[in-house]
Amino acid sequence: MVSLEARVREVKGKREARRLRRSGEVPAVVYGPATEPIPVKIKRSVLEKIFHTISEATPIQLIIKDDQGNTVAEKTVFLKMVQRDKVSETVVHLDFYEPTKGHRMRINVPLKVVGKPVGVEKGGFLEVFHEEIPVETDPDKVPQEIEVDVSSLDLGDVIHARDLKLPEGVKCLLEEEEAVVSVLVPKEVAIEEATEEEEEAAEPEVIKRKEEEEE
């Protein structure tokens, strides 16, 4: 579990949010089924140290303090939403979700692809259609990642959502037939195979014509 410190944000509004960003802080909010929204602020320098290590499925111990540095609450939360500046792509606002025990939650879990497909050795290329898998789960059973082994995939093979191995109690929210990863056939190979099929189909017809002419 990752630990993160936040301070209570007493003043709200767009003007205050801009002021916080200029001073090196990121405005955020904590909420949940049994949690009234709590406006907080986080130092950007602290956030940047851990941001690349967390995902939506990472449990975070959020330590909330007042402006005097006194701890007012400690909560286990998940990063629900990240808002970025359209131009600079810097983080401008965060949403943290505090789940309630017994209340199932929907969350996106990173997909981890392992192995090198045999189809890639033959000239194909691996296409990952979903970098994250949406699931429904209990808060204490959130998987950190969903692993899929693609070693045995040949040209044209597909792993569907129904093929994913999930922990007990975790439900995939994709349609069963949804493609997750596949080894695609290169265009030139596909054209070559199609040409060969056409030639094979035409050959019997040519032989038949010759037989008719000889008769």
Curated annotation (Swiss-Prot):
Keywords: Ribonucleoprotein, Ribosomal protein, RNA-binding, rRNA-binding
GO cellular component, as recorded: cytosolic large ribosomal subunit
CDD domains assigned: Ribosomal_L25_TL5_CTC
GO biological process, alphabetically ordered: translation
Superkingdom as given in the UniProt entry: Bacteria
Stored InterPro entries: Rbsml_bL25/Gln-tRNA_synth_N, Ribosomal_bL25/Gln-tRNA_synth, Ribosomal_bL25_b-dom, Ribosomal_bL25_C, Ribosomal_bL25_long, Ribosomal_L25_dom, Ribosomal_uL5_bac-type
Pfam family, one: Ribosomal_L25p
Molecular function in Gene Ontology: 5S rRNA binding; structural constituent of ribosome
Signal peptide: none
Keyword tRNA processing: no
Family: Belongs to the bacterial ribosomal protein bL25 family. CTC subfamily.
Biological function: This is one of the proteins that binds to the 5S RNA in the ribosome where it forms part of the central protuberance.
UniProt cross-references to PANTHER family, sorted A to Z: RIBOSOMAL PROTEIN L25/GLN-TRNA SYNTHETASE, ANTI-CODON-BINDING DOMAIN-CONTAINING PROTEIN, RIBOSOMAL PROTEIN L25_GLN-TRNA SYNTHETASE, ANTI-CODON-BINDING DOMAIN-CONTAINING PROTEIN
UniProt subunit comment: Part of the 50S ribosomal subunit; part of the 5S rRNA/L5/L18/L25 subcomplex. Contacts the 5S rRNA. Binds to the 5S rRNA independently of L5 and L18.
Record's protein name: Large ribosomal subunit protein bL25
Biological source species: Thermotoga sp. (strain RQ2)
Phylogenetic lineage: Bacteria, Thermotogati, Thermotogota, Thermotogae, Thermotogales
Gene behind the chain: rplY
